[in-house]
Amino acid sequence: RRQRQMCIRDSSVWAAGVVFYNVWGGPVLVWLYVAAMACAFALRRKRPVLWRASWGVPALLLAYYLCIPATNDKEWQPSWSRLPSVEINGNEIVVKDVRSFIYRTERDFDARYVTRRFDLDKLATLDFAVSHWDGMEFVAHTMLSFGFEDGKHLALSVETRLPERGEQGSVPGLYKQFNVIYILADEEDLFALRTNYRKEDMYLYRINIDRENLKKAFLGFAEKINSLHERPRYYHTVTANCTTELVDTFKNYLGVRRWQWTPVFNGMCDQNAYDRGELLHLPGESFRELKKRSFLGHGGNGEDWPALRRRWEEGWRTFASAPVKE
């Protein structure tokens, strides 16, 4: 009986969020919903039929929630205004709408989207970025960067696609308030925005992956990126976020189960990846030592992004000709 009451309570609280975020006039109607559910609970002994009938309200709201379709037909904020696309012609990769913004401050920038070309056969490395903000240790934003033999990089970040007048938030992210977007960008945009302008604490690691699986992973991400043009999806704080989307692609396209990074409280996902052998490191190097060496700073030393990248690369020359560890 107690479990049933807890289930009713929790589902009612969740359903209140559906009313607040997804129903016209929600900020007002949610109070009517809460009052009605409270009255039904208070009268549960005198009016048990009314109380039992109220159980169906969260179920109806769940059905309504599940039927809300995602759409690309909205006005989007400039940073998320364009969906990238990836064309594969033999070994040639053509990436359209690569974000390459020029920043003066975090909010003052020139919006610029470009087309980039890469050689699939020259795809050589995959770097994993973990960026913390506001001193939060257990929460982070995770990103990837594909590296090519000719020195080119293509950065990837899974984010909330914010509509005009929309605001970031973990709770709205539970209620279909944002689309999910895969941003493909120059590192000078995606990474430098966080290190040099937002002053976040960012760490960059090299993933332990061979070239064959790296190519499979890239093609898998390309397929997911292209699919969003015809089949947009909602971002979800728990099930479809910056980390779960990366993990799902590694699982689905590489056919391995070792990619098990913590999806929500993902600030420790680099530690988890190290423990599972997913990060390259020097022989005998502890995670603490690796993390210290992988810290990119937060722009306080005045380095621009190319200088940060060059400094970081110096620490990985040891692995230039070394085989991937099992």
Question: Where would I find each of the regions flagged by the language model?
Answer:
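Alpha-helical transmembrane signal-anchor/signal-peptide segments
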Residues: 70-89
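Juxtamembrane "helix-exit" motif on the non-cytosolic side of transmembrane helices
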Residues: 15-24
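Short, small-residue-biased leader/transition segments that mark boundaries at the very start
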Residues: 1-8
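Cytosolic-side transmembrane helix boundary signature
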Residues: 31-55
